[in-house]
Amino acid sequence: MRIGLGYDVHKLVEDRPLIIGGVTIPHDKGLLGHSDADVLVHAIMDALLGAAALGDIGKHFPDSDKNFKNISSLLLLSKVKDLINKEGYKIVNIDCTIIAQKPKMLYHIDAMKKNICKCLKLDNNMLNIKATTEEGLGFTGKEEGISANAICLLD
């Protein structure tokens, strides 16, 4: 059994779609990044790679590689799944938290969960996604960015 921890953060900017968990969420700003900047999926990828001692997403999908420009993070997550499976690991469970003042994530969590479970070929009870605010504190509380944490267990 191996545990992995992932974290990601991206700045909110105008003229970008807000994509979290593979879901495009209506909002006046989106996340800035080389790929689609999906903080939730990025945190999950780092947790999985960390648990398997395979580095991080920057190692496998560098932002200097134009092939990853605006790519769907779900496609990258599928590649991470293949990497950990190749090493003989299977996902036992994943638990995640999205930290955002706005927009409210509650209404999108089921769709996020469906996307990620489909991508990783997980049963619904193997993935948990929560959302919280920081009550107006810090960069997420001031709506300057969104972050996500993920922890996973591999066997």
Curated annotation (Swiss-Prot):
InterPro entries: MECDP_synthase, MECDP_synthase_CS, MECDP_synthase_sf. Its cofactor is a divalent metal cation. A divalent metal cation binds at residues 8, 10, 42. The record marks 34, 133 as: Transition state stabilizer. Pathway: Isoprenoid biosynthesis; isopentenyl diphosphate biosynthesis via DXP pathway; isopentenyl diphosphate from 1-deoxy-D-xylulose 5-phosphate: step 4/6. 4-CDP-2-C-methyl-D-erythritol 2-phosphate binds at residues 8-10, 34-35, 56-58, 61-65, 100-106, 132-135, 139, 142. Binds 1 divalent metal cation per subunit. Its EC number is 4.6.1.12. Homotrimer. This is 2-C-methyl-D-erythritol 2,4-cyclodiphosphate synthase. It comes from Clostridium botulinum (strain Kyoto / Type A2).
